[in-house]
């Protein structure tokens, strides 16, 4: 029996003796920090393809505008701003040179007849986004079918969580709790033509939906919360305004250090001193962190 094993080992040794292993040399090219182009520089001189219409006289709009300025900068979308409170509705330019319009205002009354012009532009192939839950006014009721709205109430409901669709964004299909929720979302019932991309986890209130309107498209964000952590949801909603959106994928990892940084207690801990032979400060720096 031993002779058989020895013979097999000898055969394997002879068979593998001619096999040479070598490791390939891989080098990852890194872009020098001073060669990286800031987003603001990359957008400089670019022709705006997005028109953002705001009315900073309305409550909360100025803060929302600040968030969307950052979102559009991060997405490198060149845009032009028109503030109804400063410029007036007549400052809204011809929409023929734009492929998307974002309305940053709950009340549509200030648009006047320009709202009809915008909706005609959408029907001809433009894309329109309502970034804030719209007030239920006569203006909204006129255009509601084009937004995919069957009926809208005058009350607002609590958005305690958000459940994005799996085809809406990475991480879709899961429920995400919203901190400090309040009655922020307009109570609406949608038409069958509307495509709901995100909803609340409890009552299923539509939070983000789109609707085909003629040759164009409308997108409504009914979230009503604009904390920094919500930027990803609004960026995903902006991506619905086009047929395709490019975004970077970073091959990286994040490590979270518990309680870092924090004040370090002085002195020695009984068990830390016994088990590690270190002071509390040294244990924090050399072991825990």
Residue locations for each model-derived region?
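Catalytic beta-strand/loop cores that center a nucleophilic Ser/Cys/Thr
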Residues: 159-217, 222-227
């Amino acid at each position: 029996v031993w002779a058989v094993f020895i013979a097999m080992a000898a055969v394997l040794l002879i068979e593998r003796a001619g096999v040479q292993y070598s490791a390939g040399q891989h080098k990852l090219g890194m872009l020098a920090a001073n060669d990286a182009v800031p987003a603001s520089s990359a957008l400089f001189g670019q022709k705006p393809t997005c028109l953002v219409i705001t009315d900073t006289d309305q409550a909360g709009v100025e803060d929302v505008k600040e968030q969307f300025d950052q979102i559009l900068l991060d997405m490198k979308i060149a845009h032009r701003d028109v503030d109804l409170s400063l410029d007036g509705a007549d400052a809204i330019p011809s929409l023929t040179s734009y492929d998307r319009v974002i309305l940053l205002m709950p009340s549509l009354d200030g648009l006047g007849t320009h709202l009809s012009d915008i909706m005609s532009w959408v029907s001809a192939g433009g894309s329109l986004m309502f970034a804030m839950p719209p007030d239920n006014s006569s203006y909204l009721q006129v255009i509601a079918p084009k937004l995919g709205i069957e009926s809208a109430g005058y009350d607002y409901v609590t958005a305690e969580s958000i459940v994005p669709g799996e085809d809406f964004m990475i991480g879709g299909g899961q429920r995400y709790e919203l901190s400090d929720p309040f009655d922020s979302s307009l109570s609406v019932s949608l038409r069958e033509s509307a495509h709901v991309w995100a909803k609340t986890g409890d009552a299923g209130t539509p939070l983000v939906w789109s609707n085909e309107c003629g040759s164009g498209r409308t997108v409504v964000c009914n979230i009503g919360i604009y904390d920094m952590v919500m930027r990803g949801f609004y960026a995903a909603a902006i991506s619905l305004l086009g047929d395709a959106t490019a975004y970077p994928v970073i091959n990286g990892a994040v490590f979270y250090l518990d309680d870092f940084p924090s004040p370090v207690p002085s002195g020695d801990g009984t068990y830390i001193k016994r088990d590690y032979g270190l002071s509390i400060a040294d244990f924090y720096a050399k072991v825990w962190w």
